[in-house]
Amino acid sequence: KLGIPIIYSPIRGVHKRMLKDLRRYTKFYSVFDWAPHSNWASKLFVKRMNKVGIKTSKMTNPTTLELAKIVVDTSYYGWLINYAQISQMIASKHEVDYDEMWSFASEIHKFLGNRPKLFPGFIGGHCVIPNLDLIHDKTLDEIKKMNSLYSRKIKK
């Protein structure tokens, strides 16, 4: 056990525009309540973030925030890209235009907001796939498998 509070606050944003994204997104943070001086640390963190124009939001504990980052952010994004990969492979198999096929959902997304079109491509980088290894979930591991399958199919 440490004698000082540790604040956990994952990064949100895209690396090539990180400074802009750090200011754009709310800075979620958490510290265990049992940590010494956790209230003081939280207040100081919020004060410093607000001083540079960054909004903050505290989650109840670091575990919730870590799962939010991995499950709700990067893994969800991976699933969406996987669906784009699958739909592109199906379109290619049937020799139809991917964008034309997806135009069918444009109006639905406009009115309902629940049919976003993502663009297929190999999931690289150092967020989505590496974060899957932190969660140890067989279902989420399917993202890696589909990404590998997509890579092999596209190279043909």
For the regions a language model picked out, list residue spans one by one.
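C-terminal substrate-binding/catalytic lobe of Rossmann-fold NAD(P)-dependent oxidoreductases
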Residues: 97-155
